[in-house]
Amino acid sequence: MAYSTLFIIALTAVVTQASSTQKSNLTFTLADFVGDWQQTAGYNQDQVLEQGGLSSLFQALGVSVTPIQKVVLSGENGLKADIHVIIPYEGLSGFQMGLIEMIFKVVYPVDDHHFKIILHYGTLVIDGVTPNMIDYFGRPYPGIAVFDGKQITVTGTLWNGNKIYDERLINPDGSLLFRVTINGVTGWRLCENILA
């Protein structure tokens, strides 16, 4: 009888410990996302040109560019990913420079020989994100996710035949809540919180 009691106590302790561990994993902080966001926001030069829709422009201008990834805090609860594209002044005509300024509106001087444009690739906001939401990031197909305690539907669409999935989280009332764009080839994600 004593052995049975001890076994039950030990088993209860194990279950309780597992339960408390599981509960502790139900909340995430910004630090939990930093590594993944930096990795999935990483673009090489070809990806920046292609996915940023800039390939034809820079090919026509005949200039070499250097993309630099910047991942910064965006408030207390989000990460913002930008790509800073460094462009040399050398070799650009007045017409070409005017074209760049017309398209990108703002150019930023870097030094006497270079300027940059900034491509904004979205902000990841993590308020209310649950483990189900984490699972969703790797699923380029329809499913169910939980956001801020509410169950919502995820829909996946193929965009432009380029294996880019534009996935949306939709509230029960049909309003759009959160969007994640996943490139099925390279695996990068553009995460946008689109709450009004």
Swiss-Prot record:
Stretch forming the signal peptide: 1-27
The record's catalysed reaction(s) read: coelenterazine + O2 = coelenteramide + hnu + CO2
Which superkingdom heads the taxonomic lineage of this protein's source? Eukaryota
The principal localisation class reads secreted
Cell compartment(s), UniProt:
Secreted
Task: Report further notes.
Answer: The shrimp has luminous glands at the base of its antennae and legs, and ejects a cloud of brightly luminescent secretion from the base of its antennae upon stimulation.
State which Enzyme Commission number(s) the record gives: 1.13.12.13
Its activity depends on temperature as follows: Optimum temperature is 40 degrees Celsius.
**UniProt enzyme class:** oxidoreductase
Mind listing the UniProt keywords for this protein, alphabetically? Luminescence, Oxidoreductase, Secreted, Signal
Annotated Gene Ontology cellular components are: extracellular region
Q: How does it assemble?
A: Heterotetramer of a catalytic 19 kDa and a non-catalytic 35 kDa subunit.
Protein task: Catalytic subunit of oplophorus-luciferin 2-monooxygenase. Oxidoreductase that converts coelenterazine (the oplophorus luciferin) to coelenteramide under emission of blue light with a maximum at 454 nm. Is also active with bisdeoxycoelenterazine.
Q: How is its activity regulated?
A: Inhibited by micromolar Cu(2+).
Activity's dependence on pH? Optimum pH is 8-9.
Protein's UniProt name: Oplophorus-luciferin 2-monooxygenase catalytic subunit
Which Gene Ontology MF annotations are present? Oplophorus-luciferin 2-monooxygenase activity
GO annotation (BP), single: bioluminescence
Whose protein is this, by species? Oplophorus gracilirostris
